[in-house]
Amino acid sequence: MSEEKKGQQYLAALHQAFPGVVLDEGWQTKDQVTVTIKVNYLPEVVEFLYYQQGGWLSVLFGNDERQLCGNYAVYYVMSMEKGEKCWLTVRVEVDPHKPEYPSVTPRVPAAVWGEREVRDMYGLVPVGLPDERRLVLPDDWPDELYPLRKDSMDYRQRPAPTTDSETYEFINELGNKKNNVVPIGPLHVTSDEPGHFRLFVDGENIIDADYRLFYVHRGMEKLAETRMGYNEVTFLSDRVCGICGFAHSTAYTTSVENGMGIVVPERAQMIRAILLEVERLHSHLLNLGLACHFVGFDSGFMQFFRVREASMKMAEILTGARKTYGLNLIGGIRRDLLKNDMIQTRQLAQQMRRDVQELVDMLLSTPNIEQRTVGIGRLDPEIARDSAT
């Protein structure tokens, strides 16, 4: 790798704090390094990188690598922000004959969702995990059947349900049994996707809350793995989300390109950046409109959606559709941007800038918005840090 590698300072600190713990290290790109460590040191290493070296846990996932190294693997991907910015991934191998590894969650609470998911999908048990409830799999899914193992099951048939009742337990950590319970969902008029929330209340005060998601989990990862080729997955990743599909397909194509050493032309990279910005515009305007709706300011909701229409028109001009689907390919972009299309897009962007500024000024001068937002829902910085928020 000809370019200077980033992350050297973190590796030096890691070797100094934990001598002999790192088994292997290697760069995937100039700013992305992976270290394989001894599994019993996992909680201490992640805690050290997270709190002392300024890392943020972006994602963690498992992988069935028995055909590669004879073991499963778990990856903790961290965005290092304190000094030199880079991605540092901590990898451990897990023995398939004893699929256990020490949980990081007691030391870094942000790991709880990822470790629950790894247990659901791979059957790898994080020993010491405080929350052992299922995360992704439904209550009637058979025990000892782990969907993302390579030899798991025949996916042409759904396994027979093991129960006809809901067994999931919602937890009220901060309250008591005397609290009233207000259920919201799984289907609710304000929800864009199914999600079941339980609010534990004492009078008008919400004491605690718990929730359950993944009601419409589609198994896209296994679908891509078992039924699609590399290029077909690009179109599937576009449809991970109805709002931010191009971001997902860019993440997928970039990963494949980095792994295979494919150099993407500069013009294709610029077109990707433009389409990502178009997607960001319509996504942010959508959520600003919804924020107005949630506080009872429906005039703002309608105005933001009116302005958002221009971003949808941008997408149609540049891609042929009102969403940025189907443009990404491994190695580049499916079609170029024409000069006249770019001129129209610039004109729309200039008008949107003026319209959005007017709407922001209107919001900031509306007393009801101020009353329902200023000082509301403040999250303690320490809790935010623990949760990688």
Where do the PLM segments sit?
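Catalytic cofactor-binding cores of redox enzymes
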Residues: 112, 133, 137-205, 209-389
